[in-house]
Design a protein with these regions (language model features):
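An alpha-beta-alpha
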Residues: 1-35, 145-160
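Hydrophobic alpha-helical segments within soluble ligand-binding/sensing domains
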Residues: 1-10, 26-34, 51-59, 79, ...
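Short, intrinsically disordered, charge-balanced linker/junction segments flanking boundaries
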Residues: 2, 45, 65-68
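Small/polar loops that bind or transfer phosphate-bearing groups
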Residues: 12, 20, 46, 74, ...
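Conserved H-loop
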Residues: 38-40, 92
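Short beta->alpha junction loops
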Residues: 43-52
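Flexible loop/turn connectors
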Residues: 59-60, 64-160
């Protein structure tokens, strides 16, 4: 989004949610900062984990600034709602507004255009958690361990 965008916006969730609310927004803002791109607070909206919320937040953003050309959503579900709103306003994706989500959910592969997203290795992290839990049960030891799991950008048709 950063390479081809000029006017950025973000739809997230409450900061009470550390992973989705805080960390994803922090990551987005740090990428903008590293690329010397300013974003005003009024272009950062907070919604809920639903398509309806993504739709409503995108509607607010576009009414406030019709020239937004790049939108990141904290979840794919919210991004799908935003895409619906953007298309209903007669804008083209990605030509007028490029959109990306996070999560690599199944619906993102089915919509038109297909959603650019970030894939997390949930299966791998689940297996690692199960291994850690099994070790805890079998060894009766609470070994604290932090594992950082990687993610991958999945480029599809919703970005330029």
């Amino acid at each position: 989004l950063v390479e081809k965008g000029q006017n950025f916006a973000y739809i997230g969730v409450t900061d009470r949610d550390e992973a989705v609310g805080q960390q994803r927004k922090k990551g987005f803002l740090s990428v903008l900062y590293r690329n010397k791109i300013d974003i005003s607070q009024d272009k950062i909206k907070e919604g809920t984990f639903t398509m309806d919320s993504g739709y409503e937040m995108a509607k607010e953003l576009l009414e406030q600034d019709p020239k937004i050309d790049s939108l990141l959503c904290a979840t794919d579900t919210m991004a799908i709602g935003a895409i619906t709103c953007i298309k209903e306003k007669g804008l083209r994706i990605p030509e007028d507004v490029q959109v990306a989500g996070i999560g690599d959910g199944a619906l993102g592969k089915l919509i038109d255009p297909k959603l650019t997203t970030v894939h997390f290795y949930y299966k791998t992290s689940g297996m690692e958690a199960a291994t850690m839990l099994t070790d805890l049960i079998e060894n009766d030891k609470g070994i604290q361990k932090e594992i950082k799991m990687s993610c991958e950008l999945v480029e599809r048709a919703s970005h330029r």
